């Protein structure tokens, strides 16, 4: 888990790891009769942890893509995301996915959001976490960022004066599942 991506996984005011994915993982562990052990890391290294056998599963808002499904077994979807293009409030240049062409964005490099941004012609700056992404956006160093619609609303709840907005939503929802090594029967 990243521990930096509210409302999925983040730290509360007492520095406890909390969020929707933490609750999902705890429920899975309870059903399996095991204790959940949470290991935090940067997004770009989490799937590699499954490859190396360091982690059994990754519960961190992982979109089920064709490419990932070729490499990992996935649980049934447990959530659906809509990708939001988030911009500064004054930005009226970006109003559709196609308007990302030639623009700058920031995301963790191996995320689905980075792939979508690149698909629409945006240049992606790699970041370590969500806070870094919003810092770049608010400072005007990038034109936009792509993320889950729910993540935007959660950020605005915590930062109601942030001068950002959703410019548009990708019309297609993504399915969120739990990846594990191919052939793992805990599915």
Where in the sequence are the language-model features?
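Short loop->beta-strand "edge-of-pocket" segments that line small-molecule binding or catalytic clefts
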Residues: 1-2, 97-110, 123
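A bilobed periplasmic-binding-protein/Venus flytrap-type ligand-binding module shared by bacterial periplasmic
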Residues: 84-93, 173-186
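A ligand-binding cleft/hinge motif common to bilobed small-molecule-binding domains
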Residues: 45-48, 62-70, 116-119, 143-172
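Extracytoplasmic small-molecule ligand-binding "clamshell" domains
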Residues: 1-61
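Flexible hinge/capping segments at coil-to-helix
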Residues: 75, 88-104
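Short Pro/Gly-enriched coil loops immediately N-terminal to beta-strands
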Residues: 72-84, 167-175
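Alpha-to-beta junction loops
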Residues: 33-35, 51-60, 103-104, 138-151
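Short helix-initiation/N-cap motifs at beta->coil->alpha
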Residues: 20-23, 37-48, 92, 110-111, ...
